Amino acid sequence: MCSSDLAAPTPVASPAPQPPAVPMHDQDFARRVVGISRYLNAIRRYGFLAVQLDPLGTPPPGAVELHLDEYGITEADLELVSGEALGFPHLKTGKDVAERLKYRYTRNLAVEFVHCGTDEERQWFRQIFTAEQLTRPLMPDEKKKVLQRLSQVEGLERFLARAFVGYKRFSIEGTDALVPMLDTALEESAAAGAHTVAISMAHRGRLNVLTNVLGKPIEQLFSEFMGRHDHLVGAGTGDVKYHLGYNNDTETRAGRKLHVTLVPNPSHLEVVNPVLQGLARARQRNATDPYERDEFAVVPICIHGDAAFPGEGIVAETFNLAHLRGYSVGGTLHVIVNNQVGFTTEPVDSRSTRFASDLAKGFEMPIIHVNADDPEACVIAMRIAVAYRTTFGRDFLIDLVGYRRHGHNEGDEPAYTQPLTYEKIRNHATVRQLWGERLVREGVATPADVEGAEREVAAQLQRIYEAAKVAPVAAHGWEQFEEPMTPVVTSVRSDLLLTVNEALLTWPDHFTPHPRLVKQLDRRREVMDAVGGIDWGHAEALAFASILADGVSIRLTGQDAERGTFSHRHAVLRDVRTGQSWTPLQHIAGTASAFEIYNSPLSETAVMGFEYGFSVAAPDTLTLWEAQFGDFVNVAQPIIDQFLTADRAKWGQDSGLVLLLPHGFEGQGPEHSSARLERFLQLAAEQNMRIAYPSNPAQYFHVLRRQAFQKSRRPLVLMQPKSLLRLQQAMSRANDLSDGAFLAVIDDPARSEEHTSELQSHHDLVCRLLLEK
């Protein structure tokens, strides 16, 4: 018998000890605690549905989840459970806890945050609604300041209505609190380190924001109404006053310097959104290191309409850019100016969601709904929004729920289509009146204070109006409007071409590109020493490298732009073993400029709009957008029509954006055969845009360099035919780059003088025949 057989027998396990039975009353207590905890979480989650948001009295929808019986508990149960058992040791009972949470979540701030993407964000909201640093009420002096601002807002609208009867102004009345909200955004952003705030908005309330937030002189606004002020002094078509932009250097109440910009925009609602993002991205660049950005330095604020926000697809397209590496701006503050009607269309016919803001939830954006008749809640909401952006670098949305006191414009009769709503509005006190009454009740102001603020604003506006009537017509304008196109030397010394070419073909020793690609790139080294052989992709790389070497930064984006839609660019190399990337154009020795290239999302309108905004704010950068093969440029037609071709005439604004439009007649069907050259030629009839159809790589090389260094900025549209990219007969020689220049028309070296004479005679004969007819 082996020793193992003599082992001691395994002892029989004794029964596991059982937990002591919980007395029935303890089980009831546990049930109460669980039910109350679920109820308290429901207040946080669904409390926004119980907030009175409509100034006109429509009751909130409520939610069954806010009823005690949903959790099998009663008011008495709330009294029986201590606050400590629920995680609130400083509160006596569960009822005290519930009342505290109701005060925070169902009173005046309707907050939606449980859909946010991280636990950290959700916990942040729980903390700020427990503490009072961000949600604290306004101090008496702050309340008086809000009264002063509301008096200025309402006073301007009333004065314009009286002085310029029948003129459109797209009044802010009903959402007046937007102005103190923007005051808060500027103040808090500057305190967080911003030196610039850039704003985009449509026509509603724009005149008030221009004057009362950006500081546009009111006398200038009055002169525009009188027809005595032309911001372009006859140099262009100009635009209606509620489309114009403005820039100003201001100082916050705390003494911090701040540059504030309102971006000009067309009537096409929301299409300015990506333009704002691109402008902000450009201005966030570090002045000393072009690859570094300070997202705290520039804060974008995007103001939307309640009908356009869910209705216009550009909103979602722009949201999708928010966290992409090529487009992030560190968060945007969004405000929906929600007057609960789209021209004459009711919400039931303009969206398929409960709230106008629901689209934002799909992008994990926190939302606060506020009643526009409660300026204090509006200011607190903006305070929270700026703090959230500063903390997380993400977008935040405020839904400002108000009304529109007049029709779509002041000449419109809204009672035709919304008779009941406008009966309520006619009998509803203004935001300023309600706020003044509240301050009187609270003892913060006297009736004389409230009336005095109103009279002071009216008297000031009357003085400005009288002065504007006799002031000379403004004579300042865009002196550079007719700036001529200057000659640019686009050739590059052959030794520099060889140097940058070698840099383009150099990568780290440990880096392994695809072997087939290495063979293609090696050919680029060989052709620099031989006659002919430079193709389009090679010429582009040399153009970019030489532009960078001359101190101009480059930004190129588009669908599949890194590789190139025809696999001709390969600006970004990939290591076949590790997947790591290497961008040779970012390693040109001795350059202080930056090369940025990004594959864009599958969007044309938003991405082109973004690049347009970037190009406006970064005149020292060659900015390019490349369409995907398939004639997809027409998807971005609003950006082309309203910004690229018309910005100079309407707003005196310049862009040097380059559009690269790959296409060709290779039997690929009607969707891949035309970049619509004829449309661009029509749009460029006033020399507001440059259009080129290069037929060889050298032409492409020179036109890119000319665009990079041309002082007179215009958009450049470049047709890029697919069939010529690698065509042997269309290749260029190295000396075409070092000795040549861009040719508006390429002469045919094979033509004969005799043929030219015959052609001229034929032309003259045809002209005579036409004249005789």
Residue ranges and their predicted role:
Residues 134-156, 227-289, 584, 710-753:
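Active-site cores of enzymes that catalyze phosphoryl transfer or operate on phosphate-rich substrates
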Residues 342-353, 361-397, 402-406:
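Conserved phosphate-handling catalytic cores of large alpha/beta enzymes
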Residues 195-368, 566-618:
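Cofactor-binding active-site loop characterized by glycine-rich and histidine/acidic residues
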Residues 21, 31-41, 48-77, 217, ...:
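Flexible, glycine-rich loop/tail regions that form catalytic "lids" or insertion modules at the edges
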Residues 27, 169-176, 259-270, 288, ...:
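Alpha-helix capping and helix-loop boundary segments enriched in small/acidic/polar residues
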Residues 155, 159-219, 522-525, 534-548, ...:
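Active-site pocket-lining segments that scaffold enzyme catalytic pockets across diverse folds
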Residues 6-177, 194:
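Extended, charge-enriched "interface" segments that sit outside catalytic cores
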Residues 1-3, 755-761, 765:
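Short, small-residue-biased leader/transition segments that mark boundaries at the very start
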